[in-house]
């Protein structure tokens, strides 16, 4: 049920016509405001516009957060001339701690994106007969939500912890293959871009995040599913190379005297 607000205003300006003019000098006005019921608001909203807007807002907040972190660490040199080299150092780093921090930032960002899609799914289910999402859009958002939470949020957060902890726990100065470590991280944004390309083209993957056949085979898949599979290949390559890097580091870079059974439990 919608709500209607009516505001009546009255202003006496003292210009009544003569002593017996009564209220002829009063100025009256009325303002009417209507609030549509939630069902109509949800039905009229474009889910892809809502998703794009919220992701853009999240990216802007992330940019402001980076600027604030730079300001807190460099309060006396808060200019673009200093900020550009600072951010370039982070984007090109091979240091295991910085790469781990990049994993944390990416994981938390996509955790928010996955939460946004979960919220939109719950909006669809909140009202009986709601058509905020069509059947195809619901399947697409369900697929993207699961994919984002597992492959773009949980896995980067785990890799972030591993990048920070494994070299420190075994006494290694860095991972065995630092450049491969950096490349493994940057494969994740590439995979995310491919995965989300389909949904913004109007043909997002609707296979479920597990990608079971026959939904992903060539006879039934559309462009969005193809892009989703390509993105998954990038993410699988990222996690595989990361695993190889960690195994190599643990095998050949342990501190002298540390055997396989002397390593910390986390490693």
Task: Write out the residue ranges for each language-model feature.
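...captures the hydrophobic TM-helix bundle architecture rather than a specific catalytic motif
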Residues: 1-267
């Amino acid at each position: 049920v919608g709500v209607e607000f009516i505001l009546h205003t009255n202003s006496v300006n003292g210009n009544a016509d003569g002593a017996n003019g009564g209220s002829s000098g009063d100025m009256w006005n009325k303002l009417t405001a209507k609030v549509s019921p939630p069902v109509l608001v949800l039905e009229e909203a474009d889910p892809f516009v809502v998703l794009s807007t919220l992701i853009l807002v999240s990216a802007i907040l992330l940019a402001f957060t980076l600027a604030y972190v730079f300001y807190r660490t460099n309060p006396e040199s808060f200019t673009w001339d200093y900020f550009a080299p600072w951010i370039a150092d982070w984007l090109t780093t091979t240091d295991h701690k910085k790469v781990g921090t990049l994993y944390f930032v990416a994981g938390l960002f996509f955790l928010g994106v996955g939460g946004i899609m979960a919220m939109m799914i719950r909006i669809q289910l909140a009202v009986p007969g709601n058509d905020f999402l069509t059947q195809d859009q619901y399947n697409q958002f369900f697929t993207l939500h699961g994919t984002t939470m597992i492959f773009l949020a949980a896995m980067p957060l785990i890799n972030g912890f591993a990048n920070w902890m494994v070299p420190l726990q075994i006494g290694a100065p860095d991972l065995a293959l630092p450049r491969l470590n950096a490349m493994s991280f940057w494969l994740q944004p590439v995979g995310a871009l491919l995965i989300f390309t389909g949904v913004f083209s109007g043909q997002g993957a609707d296979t479920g995040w597990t990608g079971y056949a026959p939904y992903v085979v060539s006879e039934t898949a559309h462009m969005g599913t193809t892009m989703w599979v390509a993105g998954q290949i990038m993410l699988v390559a990222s996690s595989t190379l990361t695993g190889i890097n960690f195994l190599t580091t643990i095998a050949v870079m342990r501190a002298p005297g540390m055997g396989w059974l002397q390593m910390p439990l986390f490693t």
